[in-house]
Amino acid sequence: MNPYIFFIIMSTVMLGTLIVMTSTHWLLVWMGFEMNMLAIIPLLMKQYNPRSMEAATKYFLTQATASMLLMLAIMINSLYSGQWTFTKLMNPTASVIMTLALTMKLGLAPFHFWVPEVTQGISLPSGLIMLTWQKIAPFSGLYTLAPIINLDLLLVVSILSVAIGGWGGLNQTQLRKIMAYSSIAHMGWMTSILVFNPTMTLLNLFLYVLMTTTTFMLLMAASTTTTLSLALMWNKMPLITTSTLAMMLSLGGLPPLTGFMPKWMIIQELTKNNNIILATLMAITALLNLFFYMRLAYTTSLTMFPTTNNMKMKWQLNTTNQTKYLPLLIIMSTMTLPLTPTMVLLN
């Protein structure tokens, strides 16, 4: 892709997100979502093959449907309230429709079907943008709606997302699909405390973006997209492979890695608000995520080939990608759990 075109597209994607985050007028919010959606489609189709075309089409149809629902909710609200700006008094029907539209944009259950399919059909850099930056705008919309959102609807969506994010990843061998189901589960964890503690939700979103970015950069450095190719990486890039497995376990929420911090804080917040059953269910379903990450770590690091035939191994023919930023990202993504006591300020 031409560097100038790439710069224009990325600027539009960022501008759309910033418009959504800073606007107080519903029409501008809708325009920001549209700019964001239309600008990212060329990035999804960058490889220009049938699979990426199909992924971009699925993404467009899903996001366009969510945008229509969002506009419907905005119009219903303006019909009842007589204004287009954010207000604490919002029509209940409009609030429910708007919540469903934003959950569809985020890829939360039961509107999650597009996330694994789209992620699998696009390149790793495009997948990184879709699973990190593209989550910020819908989350800022939910953050704005937090005081008036339907709590029961949000809790049902969050527990469904955590469960489906765990179940869906159990039989996957494609790393991009595993990351997609992990994204669905993490989004479910974050939305569960959105009403109770929105600031903590933003912290968890930051940690999720940090860990997902690090994992994708490791996969890009190793040029691997399947569990088999990751298992064959030991003789090619042993440090990258080890770091990838540590990041996978951190995403699964295994203590003492960073990924345990958001789960710990969210369960503590839920129990503080007398949601004991929900906290228990989410802790149990989190084991599904941890299981497939542990299985991935086992198959790639603790099982070796029965023979020493070098022809089975993956040889490094091309120069490796630059990894100068990776050490700092890996340290932040795996070793910041001791900072948890300083987060008491969020309560």
From Swiss-Prot:
- GO BP term, pick one: mitochondrial respiratory chain complex I assembly
Residues spanning the membrane: 1-21, 25-45, 59-79, 96-116, 145-165, 178-198, 202-222, 247-267, 276-296, 326-346
EC class, as a word, reads translocase
The keyword Transport belongs to this UniProt entry's keyword annotation: yes
Q: Which Pfam family is an annotated match for this chain, by its short name?
A: Proton_antipo_M
Q: Which GO terms describe its molecular function?
A: NADH dehydrogenase (ubiquinone) activity
Q: What name does UniProt use for this protein?
A: NADH-ubiquinone oxidoreductase chain 2
**EC number(s) given by UniProt:** 7.1.1.2
Protein family (similarity comment): Belongs to the complex I subunit 2 family.
User: GO cellular component annotations, sorted alphabetically?
Assistant: mitochondrial inner membrane
Reactions catalysed: a ubiquinone + NADH + 5 H(+)(in) = a ubiquinol + NAD(+) + 4 H(+)(out)
Assembly and interaction partners? Core subunit of respiratory chain NADH dehydrogenase (Complex I) which is composed of 45 different subunits. Interacts with TMEM242.
Q: Where is the signal peptide?
A: none
Q: Give the main location.
A: mitochondrion
Sum up the protein's function in the record's words: Core subunit of the mitochondrial membrane respiratory chain NADH dehydrogenase (Complex I) which catalyzes electron transfer from NADH through the respiratory chain, using ubiquinone as an electron acceptor. Essential for the catalytic activity and assembly of complex I.
Annotated membrane topology is: Multi-pass membrane protein
Can you say where in the cell this protein is located? Answer: Mitochondrion inner membrane
UniProt entry keywords in alphabetical sequence: Electron transport, Membrane, Mitochondrion, Mitochondrion inner membrane, NAD, Respiratory chain, Translocase, Transmembrane, Transmembrane helix, Transport, Ubiquinone
